[in-house]
From Swiss-Prot:
Signal peptide: none annotated. It holds the Pfam family NBD_C. NCBIfam families: OxoTetrKin (NF043035). InterPro entries: 4-carb_acid_sugar_kinase_N, 4-carb_acid_sugar_kinase_N_sf, NBD_C, NBD_C_sf, OtnK. The gene is otnK. ATP binds at H155, S272, A324, G344, E348, G370, G371, E372, T373, G414. This is 3-oxo-tetronate kinase. The lineage of its organism: Bacteria, Pseudomonadati, Pseudomonadota, Betaproteobacteria, Burkholderiales. Its EC number is 2.7.1.217. It comes from Cupriavidus necator (strain ATCC 17699 / DSM 428 / KCTC 22496 / NCIMB 10442 / H16 / Stanier 337) (Ralstonia eutropha). Catalyzes the ATP-dependent phosphorylation of 3-oxo-tetronate to 3-oxo-tetronate 4-phosphate. Keywords: ATP-binding, Carbohydrate metabolism, Kinase, Nucleotide-binding, Transferase. Disruption phenotype: Deletion mutant is unable to use L-threonate or D-erythronate as a carbon source. It catalyses: 3-dehydro-L-erythronate + ATP = 3-dehydro-4-O-phospho-L-erythronate + ADP + H(+); 3-dehydro-D-erythronate + ATP = 3-dehydro-4-O-phospho-D-erythronate + ADP + H(+).
Length: 432
């Protein structure tokens, strides 16, 4: 990957702990006027040739659920690369539901990045009001429900059983965690900056920041303009482009989301077991569209499930849905038999194999549901970097690979998108 030109260096460098989260963040930046390139994993020399046009770079790692020591090492390597490109400020992006365990990885990674940047403070704000994620008095809400009553308490890898993010983050951090309360945020950027100064003087290294609206996120962005590191969900990046414009570093532009339309066959691959994805699969099936369910137990028995899926797709002249999505009870039953990690890995690898096989047969448009599944699929497709286009649904943009023969992809976190998302994504990727 070549560095930006001397005349134009990227301003913002971002590290995301999963692929769909990276795309979500990149979507936010593009919508707010920053041309954005997302890399898939740590970049290699020669992976992208036109980085010089990017205002923001997003490195998509797959570090959310790996051992904390590995997540720290990968994140520090990403930071080193982003600094070498000339980025001035950095964002560590994680899920808007704060997906983590007492072992990490949010706390350990944030503390390591702070140390590497020789900084003594950052905020942690996963709020994303547009998708119903808000924080008040340090407690995270998903819609009207507390985090631990939202369905996230059943997450197979990172069950979230405590809505107090101060407690959650403190349990996985060595340094003092505090709360940047709504009282300060509601009074504007100056009051918020004053409260940050008070927290710093009190020895707080990371503060959960309350936010219940986009206006609060813009306030936080302005108040944190001079912090080397900001951490949170994609919403925390809302106000950052305006900081750069205010400083005369970023021009107003209307073409940040410009990407080419991609013709050719399409497919939907769903590995998420979230409520939203279950609803999207149900809508597809209700409409009588062609679909094939992947059975993890059949995979465990060594059956040729991927071959059957490829044959199924070949037998239809329209996009098909290949899915492993099922109800929480069904997921638990499979996990009880196979183990959590093995069950997830089998599904991800099967869908990745199907994606690679479809690519070889000419498929050009891929809609993928689920963060872990998206990570496995983009790796199987050999995707190195993406240009970020217009939004399909909140948090989910259209993307196009930076290749001689580009592919179009929509990579969504499990819980994003309305019931008709699959159809909408296929249409938008094709320029319709």
């Amino acid at each position: 990957m070549t560095a930006g030109t001397l005349a134009h260096r990227p301003l913002l460098g971002c590290i995301a702990d999963d692929f769909t989260g990276a795309t979500d963040l990149a979507n936010t930046l593009v919508r707010n006027g920053m041309r954005t390139v997302q890399t898939i994993g740590l970049p290699d020399v020669g992976a992208v040739q036109d980085i010089g046009e990017a205002d923001a770079l997003v490195v998509a790692l797959k570090s959310r659920t790996i051992p904390a020591v590995e997540a720290v090492a990968q994140s520090l390597a990403a930071l080193q690369w982003l600094r070498a490109q000339g980025c001035r400020q950095f964002v560590f992006k994680y899920c808007s539901t704060f997906d983590s365990t007492d072992a990490g990885n949010i706390g350990p990674v944030a503390e390591a990045l702070l140390a590497a940047l020789d900084s003594d403070f950052t905020i942690a704000c996963p709020a994303f009001p547009e998708n119903g994620r808000t924080i008040f008095r340090g407690h995270l809400f998903v819609g009207d429900a507390l985090l631990n009553e939202s369905g996230m308490e059943h997450h197979p890898l990172t069950p979230m059983t405590d809505a107090s993010l101060v407690r959650v983050l403190q349990r996985q951090s060595k340094n003092k965690v505090g709360l940047l309360r709504y009282d300060a945020v509601a009074r504007g950027a100056h009051a918020t900056a004053e409260r940050i100064a008070a927290l710093r003087s009190d020895g707080v290294r990371m503060a959960i920041a309350d936010a219940v609206s986009d206006a609060d996120l813009f306030t936080l962005g302005e108040a944190c303009a001079n912090l080397p590191l900001i951490t949170g969900g994609s919403g925390i990046a809302l106000g950052l482009p305006e900081n750069f414009r205010r400083a005369g570093l970023l021009p107003q532009r209307g073409d940040a989301a410009s990407v080419p339309a991609i013709d050719g066959p399409g497919v939907v691959l769903a590995g998420s077991a979230s409520r939203a994805t279950n609803g999207q699969v149900a809508r597809w099936l209700e409409q009588g569209r062609p679909a094939l369910r992947i059975d993890p137990l059949a995979l465990a028995r060594g059956e040729a499930v991927a071959d059957a899926a490829l044959a199924f797709a070949a037998g239809h002249g329209e996009p098909v849905l290949i899915y492993a999505t099922s109800s929480p009870d069904e997921v638990k039953a499979v996990q009880a038999e196979l183990g959590v990690e093995r069950a997830g890995h089998l599904v991800e690898q099967c869908l990745a194999t199907v994606a690679a096989g479809l690519l070889a047969r000419g498929t050009r448009r891929f809609v993928v549901a689920g963060g872990e599944t998206s990570g496995a699929v983009v790796q199987a497709l050999g995707v190195r970097a993406l240009r970020i286009g217009a939004q399909i649904a909140p948090g989910v943009p259209a993307t196009v690979t930076l290749d001689a023969k580009p592919l179009a992809l929509a990579l969504k976190s499990g819980n994003f998108g309305g019931p008709d998302f699959f159809d909408e994504a296929l249409r938008q990727l094709g320029g319709h």
